[in-house]
Amino acid sequence: MKARQVLVFLLSVGAALAALWLVFPADGIAAGGITLRFASRDGYLRDASAVKVDVDSVLTGVASRFEMEADTLEHYRRFFHDNPDRIYLPDDDDHYFDAVFQQMEKASEEGRTVRVLHYGDSQIEMDRISQDLREALQERFGGSGTGLFPALGNVPSGSISRSASGALEHYTMYGDSTTQRAGHNRYGPLAQVVQLSGEATVNLRPTTNKNAREGAKEFSRISVLYGRPSPDFSLKVTSDTLKAKVTTETSPSGVTLSVWQFSRPVRRASVRLNGSAEIYAIGADGPFGVTVDNIPLRGCSGTIFTRISKPLMEESLSLEDVRLIILQFGGNYMPVARSTKVIEQYQEQIARQISYFQEVAPEAKILFIGPSDMGKSVNGRIVTWPRLPEVVDSLKATALRSGAAYWDLYRMMGGENSMGQWVKHVPPYAGPDHIHFTPAGARKVGEAFSQ
């Protein structure tokens, strides 16, 4: 075939495709139970006319709206009533968090620690978002360390290096069919339990993760929360040649918190266990102040807590002096949120979880963080998941009606179709799955939340 003929052929094909592009419906053509799709002029114009979120402008706006008159009490009152990026308070109660902050201030003065539990799905794995809140609170109220974590687990921590060996078995309340479930409901505050059946050692040292905050790497207080010990159970924490002051407190039903307080921060520590016991959590903290516990529950929609032993959870949270509980869920529910009725059922489940925490931690306040924007391919375009705005609004209404505060992450990002712009940002603030934040994006979210 001559070059001229090839050129004519290519031009003819191009002309035919251009003509098809001009007339093809944007929503495709239904034929025999299937839909034929092709790039179209209407679809192109629709994309071109769509409002695109400027991520940098959104984040700058969040910061500037908070900074204006931030040194006045009147500003804070207006912020919680009028600022679109605010934390929404139940009954518009300006004093909702007063008791929390009072306890945080007293903690440093009295040489004790108070805890903030941050539960979430995989969006907060590797200490994402939690570490920014931790850093902000510890700068203001004092404290250091990374908080609570399981003795053994399949999700690494972003702020501490942990290695375990010996007779330990890990069970979780959440996860798919590949995760092990215990034959009871005594899972503790991390929604997981590690069964000790013999000798075991858990070694701890500061993480080498480049994204970890320096304050999280510094700890001088090692604690172990456990229950149902055998008569021959023994527990010891060692760190180089340093000696520690050891205290132990046991609840009426036998949940025990043992604490090793060293005279200065340690570079490494070993927790040595022997016998039989249920290990609910290990903590690595500073001697006083605030600690924020990152508790990622991969694949969870936040509806599992009511299945955990209420007496065990109540006594655990009391021993750990928990004053704020953050629940960050909703994203994992989107694949099944196909109707308003299903969403209403989810509302009821979330309301029960909030009520559960209000019962087991009456001294704590509860804050619910809704899902981020999430992108899904529809007709070749990445758009917000169908019904996500409805889920966001329903969760907000449920939290406030149940007496919990609410922070709207979806709106903070820029609302509908904003996730695509977070993905396209340089550097990327979200991954190619259009669901999870990158470390840089998670930091922006954490900073916005911590304002």
List each language-model region with its residue ranges.
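Conserved SGNH/GDSL esterase-like catalytic core that processes O-acyl groups on lipids
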Residues: I124-T238, T247-E348, H436
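Catalytic His-Asp segment of secreted/periplasmic serine-dependent ester chemistry enzymes
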Residues: K310, S372-Q451
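Alpha-helical scaffolding within the catalytic cores
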Residues: D92-E105, F305-L319, E348-Y356, P389-E390, ...
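Active-site segments of SGNH/GDSL-like serine hydrolases
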Residues: L36, Q328-M334, Y356-V392, D408
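Juxtamembrane proline-rich low-complexity "stalk" or linker regions positioned immediately after a signal peptide
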Residues: D27-H75
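Hydrophobic membrane-insertion alpha-helices, especially the h-region
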Residues: L7-P25
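Short hydrophobic beta-strand that contains or immediately precedes a catalytic carboxylate
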Residues: V116-G120
